[in-house]
């Protein structure tokens, strides 16, 4: 049995459905979703991510607007630019590519995006909806992608033990809320956790998002583990590897996502899905 999860194939299924849905919008309303991507500076890694987002958006019929601003921009000026996008009725969704330069107040910027156009799901209001169990607003895309993969291979999560290694607002915290809603018993671990392997090795599901190359080795898992590696670490020659020692772990677990080709494509698919949701909400479809 092939236990390596093909995130690209799963993402392509979502993209195919979105493409059909958007074609229907165009026939019915003569309009289509539009995603604004705000980039500050010219970080090479950010440029690669944005290129992939635009490519996939165009593939399904979502228009895009790239707003590329100087690294030297002030927080207030960036907020003003975001407000312009908030008021633009042609824009369905807005994302701000992270990380931002250290001179910019990231919390203020993420809070400036209109919650109803918050395709990334980072606005405090949307975060509050998620953690309050209110079925409203937008959920961070990587967390949605992780949950979709997990449910594909473990449809019934009732009573499952899930360990999330990493406590970020992008992955760890939102995914913990989603897994709790699925009736998992959830443990969040982080850099200060003692005896990490003794915790992860007992879990049914282990999600790793710490940004530390090949950190988790075979002894961190058991033969029934479903391992979701969210790590994206660039090493020499621009090669990308995950947080899990994939080559030595893959034969020791039930299922595992590779890096690249695992959660990355799913993140983009759910970003576009969120954008379509914002578009539908705006025109009350």
Swiss-Prot record:
Question: Where does it sit, as one GO cellular component term?
Answer: cytosol
Q: Which PANTHER family match?
A: C-1-TETRAHYDROFOLATE SYNTHASE, CYTOPLASMIC (PTHR48099:SF5), C-1-TETRAHYDROFOLATE SYNTHASE, CYTOPLASMIC-RELATED (PTHR48099)
Question: Member of which family?
Answer: Belongs to the tetrahydrofolate dehydrogenase/cyclohydrolase family.
What is this protein identified as? Answer: Bifunctional protein FolD
Q: Which CDD domains match?
A: NAD_bind_m-THF_DH_Cyclohyd (cd01080)
Please give the Gene Ontology molecular function terms for this protein: methenyltetrahydrofolate cyclohydrolase activity; methylenetetrahydrofolate dehydrogenase (NADP+) activity
Q: Which organism is it from?
A: Rickettsia typhi (strain ATCC VR-144 / Wilmington)
UniProt keyword annotation of Phosphoprotein present: no
Which residues does the annotation say bind NADP(+)?
166-168, 191, 232
GO biological process per UniProt: L-histidine biosynthetic process; methionine biosynthetic process; purine nucleotide biosynthetic process; tetrahydrofolate interconversion
């Amino acid at each position: 049995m092939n236990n390596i999860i093909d995130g690209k194939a799963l993402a392509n299924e979502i993209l195919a459905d979105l493409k059909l849905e958007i074609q229907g919008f165009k026939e019915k309303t003569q309009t289509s979703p539009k995603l604004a991507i705000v980039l500050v500076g010219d970080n090479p890694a950010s440029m690669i991510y944005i290129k992939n987002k635009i490519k996939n958006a165009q593939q399904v019929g979502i228009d895009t607007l790239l707003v590329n601003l100087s690294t030297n921009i002030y927080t207030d000026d960036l907020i003003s630019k975001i407000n312009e996008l908030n008021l633009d009725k042609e824009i369905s969704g807005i994302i701000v590519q992270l990380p931002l330069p250290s001179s910019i107040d990231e919390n203020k910027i993420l809070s400036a995006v209109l919650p109803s156009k918050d395709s990334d799901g980072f606005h405090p209001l949307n975060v509050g909806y998620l953690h309050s169990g209110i079925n409203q607003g937008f959920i961070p895309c990587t967390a949605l992608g992780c949950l979709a993969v997990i449910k594909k291979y473990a449809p019934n999560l009732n009573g499952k033990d899930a360990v999330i290694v990493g406590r970020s607002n992008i992955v760890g915290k939102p995914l913990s809320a989603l897994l709790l809603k699925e009736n998992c018993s959830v443990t969040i671990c982080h850099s200060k956790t003692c005896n990490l392997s003794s915790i992860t090795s007992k879990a049914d599901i282990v999600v790793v998002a710490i940004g530390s190359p090949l950190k988790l080795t075979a002894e961190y898992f058991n033969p029934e583990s479903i391992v979701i590696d969210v790590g994206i670490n660039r090493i020499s020659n621009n090669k990308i590897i995950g947080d899990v020692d994939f080559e030595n772990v893959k034969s020791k677990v039930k299922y595992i996502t590779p890096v690249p080709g695992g959660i990355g494509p799913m993140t983009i698919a759910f970003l576009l899905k969120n954008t379509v949701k914002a578009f539908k909400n705006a025109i009350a479809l």
